[in-house]
C-alpha cells in the first residue's frame, strides 16, 4: 500500500478507563523477539519480487504455510482461497484459531504478502512478519473469539485477494461470516535512520457505507489504547484507505489498521529492502499489535507463577520450533522465566549429540539431515519429542 499523502493527524490523549492493563497480555507481548522479526524479514526478502501469480509469489505462499506448521498448527487449521490473475493461479492463506466461547465470530488479522518491483521487505514483509510472530505466540493461548490470520495476495493489483475472499468466503458462507473486526497491517517498517516511535492507527471514514464508521472509530480508539499499554510506541489517528481492509469496509464490516507514521519512499521499487527500513520498529509494532489482538479476541488472562506451574505442566507446554529445522531450534515453555533446565539431542541409537543447560536457542548446524530425539529435563521430570533436521 502506498499513501499519497498523510492525513492531518489528531494528537489526542487516550484515556485508559475503558481498557486496563492486563499482565497476562504483557507477558505474551514480552515473548516477541527481535531475532524472530529479523529472520522473518530476511527470509521474506530471499523470495525476491513476489508479483501476484508468479513463481516467487507461490514460493512465498509455501514458506508462510510451512511457518505455521512449524509453529505447531495443524493442516486442518490452514485453508487456501485461490483465484486467477493474468492467467495464473494465486492463493490467499488463512490460518484459523477457534475461539472457546464464540467460535463462529471472527477477529480477522490480515496483511498482503505480494510485492511489485522489488522484494517488498517493508511493503509488506513488515506486516507479514508481525502476523507470523503473533500467530507463533498465540498458538496455545485460549481466546473467546476465533482468530483468522490471513495472508492476502493480489493487493498490489487492486486488492484482488481480499476482494475475492469477501466474495467467495465471507459472503458465500451460510449464514454470512460473522466478523467482529478486521485488523489490517500493511507497511509498518518505518525508515532507516529516522526516529520511528509512532504508529498510525487507521479508522473508517468512508461513507459508502457509513453505518460501520462509528464502530470503527471505537475499535480504533481501543487499538490506540493498546499501543500505549503494550508497546513503547505512540499512536497517531488517521483514516483507512487503499489496503486489504477496504473490501471488508465496503461489505459493512468494522475495520481498523496499522500503517507506518514515517512514510518510506522505497515501496514499489528495488530499494524496498531490509537495509532501508527499521526492524526494531517492526518489533515494537508487533508488541502493539499483539496487545490489541488479545484485547479484540478476549485472550485468557490467567498468569502462572513458578509455584503454580509444576515441572510436569511446564513440560506439557514445551514447544520446539521450527520443526523441521536446519541450523537452529528454539525452545519455548509456559513459564518464560524458568532458568533451571537441561536439554539434549540424541540420535536414534541414543547417543547424545548436543547437551545444553538453560538455553532457549540451540545450534544444530553441525547435525546432518535426519530424525533425532530432543529431551527436556526440569527437576525430576523429562519429556522427549521427535525433531527433524532438513538441510
Question: In which residue ranges do the predicted regions lie?
Answer:
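Structural recognition of the beta-strand scaffold that forms the well-ordered cores
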Residues: 36-45, 77-80, 92-96, 106-111, ...
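N-terminal capping segment at the start of a domain
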Residues: 20-55, 112-114, 187, 263-273
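Sec-dependent N-terminal signal peptides
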Residues: 4-13
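A non-catalytic alpha/beta surface segment that caps or lines the substrate-entry region
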Residues: 39-98
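C-terminal outer-membrane/trafficking sorting elements
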Residues: 310-321, 325-391
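Acidic/histidine-rich catalytic neighborhood of metal-dependent amide-processing enzymes
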Residues: 115-212
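Solvent-exposed loop/turn segments at secondary-structure junctions
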Residues: 49-52, 82-88, 99-102, 113-118, ...
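Active-site-adjacent substrate-binding region
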Residues: 191-304
